[in-house]
Amino acid sequence: MESSKKLQTYHTASIFAIDRLRMGTDGHGITTLVCLMGCPLRCAYCLNDRCHEEIYSKGSRGLYLNKGIIQLDANELYDHVKIDDLYFQATGGGICFGGGEPTRYASFIEEFRRVCGNVWKITLETSLYCSEDTIRQLAPIVDHWIVDVKDINHVI
């Protein structure tokens, strides 16, 4: 799994949490949950309100990432999570992208799949509030979909 050669990547993800060694909640085996910023929905009972916060603040010298938010490219995320490679391989686990709405980061997730290879499972915990084109883009690389249908009442 370990490779000294980095793949060229072009996309970054804004992340507010990386939660390691999860079992039984975010897909098969042991997983790491990567919580992404941003969601087009504003559900009254959202479990991850943090995803709606501003990513940047304006300062005297430009824009700054707000406290607790990191931006990583696919290689950098891999470097953060590869410590659990043995757990992922032994249990059939891998990475679960959630947070916010992971389909907003489709190109980043594609790049992450290229970086991590096909041994780890990739799970999306999603509302599927995205275009059909995005689903078609992600379908070949996502192993498991956790579709979170909170309520079909348009008022909520």
Residue ranges and their predicted role:
Residues 1-26, 79:
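Auxiliary Fe-S-binding modules of radical SAM enzymes
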Residues 9, 33, 37, 71:
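Electropositive phosphate-/nucleotide-binding environments in soluble metabolic enzymes
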Residues 14-52, 56:
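N-terminal pre-triad scaffold of radical SAM enzymes
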Residues 30, 48-141:
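Conserved Radical SAM active-site core
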Residues 139-153:
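Non-cysteine beta-strand/loop elements that form the S-adenosyl-L-methionine
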